[in-house]
Amino acid sequence: MRISIGRIAWQILAVLIAVAFTIEHDSICDESIGACGEPIHTVIRLAKRDDELARRIAADHDMHVKGDPFLDTHYFLYHSETTRTRRHKRAIVERLDSHPAVEWVEEQRPKKRVKRDYILLDNDVHHSNPFRRSVLNRDGTRRAQRQQPQSPREIPSLPFPDPLYKDQWYLHGGAVGGYDMNVRQAWLQGYAGRNVSVSILDDGIQRDHPDLAANYDPLASTDINDHDDDPTPQNNGDNKHGTRCAGEVAALAGNNQCGVGVAFKAKIGGVRMLDGAVSDSVEAASLSLNQDHIDIYSASWGPEDDGKTFDGPGPLAREAFYRGIKNGRGGKGNIFVWASGNGGSRQDSCSADGYTTSVYTLSISSATYDNHRPWYLEECPSSIATTYSSADFRQPAIVTVDVPGGCTDKHTGTSASAPLAAGIIALALEANPELTWRDMQHLVLRTANWKPLENNPGWSRNGVGRMVSNKFGYGLIDGGALVNMAKTWKTVPEQHICTYEYRLANPNPRPIVGRFQLNFTLDVNGCESGTPVLYLEHVQVHATVRYLKRGDLKLTLFSPSGTRSVLLPPRPQDFNANGFHKWPFLSVQQWGEDPRGTWLLMVESVTTNPAATGTFHDWTLLLYGTADPAQSGDPVYSATPATSQGVLSRVHQLTSQVEESAPISFPDLTSAGNCHDECNGGCTESSSATSCFACKHLTQTLRNKGGSGFKCVQKCDDTYYLDGDKCKMCSSHCHTCTKAEVCETCPGSLLLIDVDNMPHYDHGKCVESCPPGLVADYESNLVQAKCIWRKDLCGDGYYINAVGKCDLCDSSCETCTAPGPMSCEKCSKGYGKGSIGYCRPCCPEGSTKSWQCEDCSKPDPTLLIDSNKSSGFGLMFWIVVSLIAACGICACKKCASETKSSNVEYAPLAQYNATNGAINLGAHTDDEDDDEDEVFVNPQIV
């Protein structure tokens, strides 16, 4: 009996540990085990903006509102008495949650965020200047000031007289080999960032600095930490980071102060948000500030660069990013520039940083004065380009302004790289203000210069002939080339997404032991449904892996063109034993390639511990791109065979006969000649797609003709859907659709209701906010945010835990609502719950039935039981579990030290022998299952 209790206790403890640590981001805590920090504020969301209602709700709960709302309808609430007990505060929040006007409420906890510079002894030149904080209101005068037309472009006289300009080696050929970022070529065409607004998200900026004051933009500035409009940082000796970044972008030129900013005529603002506790809501409020006014947001911070953290933006920050690219700048999209990270000395990777792996950001790396990688550089395939920065104290760093009112030549790290990139991007926006956020990503990577950095190892040529590196992206940003290409750039076609989910053969999840290598292949043919992606932009891999030491894992992706991207290198400092859950790894290295063909994901371990165990669960390939070339001069890929045959048969049909419903007989008409390419059989007007006798490909109804006219097209335009050989109009609330009233994508930042399995909802409708019972999903599809049924956030085999993240169901459950066997909705294969109410193993066929197993030969009546009963029973079970766990915790260390080997019943998978290159298949004999999803190869051959 003692042995049985001990075994049960250990099983319970294992479940509790799994529940506690199965999380998406390392910063997400589990309050049930006391792992959370004290909440710093509470956020509520109302149905629409109503400041007076928000204040009344707060007052009724002995709280108060601070600052302006963010994301339109979200408000910061603070408890009136900070000495209240935690239990009292929680009770207030629970009452808030039940208020009929409150759609959502959450206590916000601090997240660890660090500035991406490092400390050198500053040789600063300080000027006497008062360092003050005063509130500056945003008024109509300020707004009108920015809207006034600027004077014509003036060609500056170089070199500038500013005293430290001579030390800005990265701007005038001062790097080894005479290299720089070719900014002077843009300046000499008169571009200096006019009419472009840049906001520095950081610890604030000194708005009255003599080298910034004339360019200061109050509409691009605020204080989220203290909830006022003045971004001036506290003068405590530490808060100089944001001011330094601002000076790199827009320090004045020709005023004999410090050096010059890259975009010295741009408007510069700052958000004070790092000078206090940082939460998801603080980040969201910063990222969503005045998105129609601000053009570029520059951020030189992120999760800890310690080599052991996986973390990224929370749900509110992700929504802010999404709204920015959808609605910002009048629908052209805000441009988010991010520093790639300073964890190189700890062998960190920016692939573990959810800000740099966001599709919406331009991740910027660094290079040194002598064109090498700096010691702090992090590698990842999401880095798009590089600027110069610092190395060590023996080499020159970056010149900029400093607080209070001085200058420095010691600005460092990738913190210095992101603002330089933002300034150069501002030059391109002045040259072409119509550029979208995706246009800018195209331009930056197409014009980047890899030649100054070519002597660094790791460069490779991708499938379209561009050189790319995990260290430097596509190379140094080239200001002159960027501006020149921007001037003639045409807006890229709409971005689409294709999703391919890998189906893992049994055993699922797949046990992994020791040093292993798994190779999974996916065959891609454009898109299984919807608009095809033939010209790649971003590539994402969402993967779930559990392993004893997360830092021993390595993930590599191979495209059909042979481009190899190391999505995750080994990180020796990362001893996390929980792996990662659906982490969005990003690569921009396949940009421009044709995605069709076989993709291969290699998952391997570099461990030296043969007893290291884990499980591989799932992976999904997300391909972002367009159906047409981005620019007219780009290579044109052939259409898929299936599509070509379909189009060909349609042409033959139109050529051979006229539809019965056609109101005219085409042979009776005389063709005008020189018909449009889409015409078939003649036309009544030359070169007009609306005057054809018949169409080669598709007939599209004209919206402005009330549906009575048509034009011939090769494919349906946006706001139309394909029905046979006709393009019919979508409903006016759709951007694209699959049927007239079933939207596929929505205009602006509207949310798409995607609940086809729940017909009582308006599936396919575009809405401003999700109806009750549905939740907004900004993560699964970055092209179109959706309203989904809450369970769909995770999928089969997972449930939503207490902190809103996906956790694994118990192994006995195929689907579940909570942890443990008591919460199964449907039992796994080989389990049943027909007689006892929870899933347990089926009795062997022909064996004597006993209380230890389930008679699975009988139908399961519990499938019809109300889920509320099951949930209540499950709650009782977990109360008992907690008591047993508390009793068994004392023996935890002793038992753990005695338990050395794995208790996984599956035979070990293939292991790679690094000494002789052999692949050891161990005792695995089920070759048929292996062939379904794995091809074991010698990595030296690959």
Curated annotation (Swiss-Prot):
One of its GO terms (biological process) is chemosensory behavior. Binds 3 calcium ions per subunit. Ca(2+) 2 binds at residues 223, 228, 230. Its cofactor is Ca(2+). Residues 893-942 are cytoplasmic. One of its GO terms (cellular component) is membrane. Residues 491-629 form the P/Homo B domain. FU repeats lie at residues 674-723, 725-777, 804-850. Glycans are attached at residues 195, 519, 868. Its EC number is 3.4.21.-. Residues 23-116 form a propeptide. Disruption phenotype: RNAi-mediated knockdown causes an arrest at the L1 developmental stage. RNAi-mediated knockdown in ASEL neuron results in a severe reduction in Ca(2+) signal in ASEL neuron and in chemotaxis in response to high salt concentrations. This is Endoprotease bli-4. It comes from Caenorhabditis elegans. The lineage of its organism: Eukaryota, Metazoa, Ecdysozoa, Nematoda, Chromadorea. The gene is bli-4.
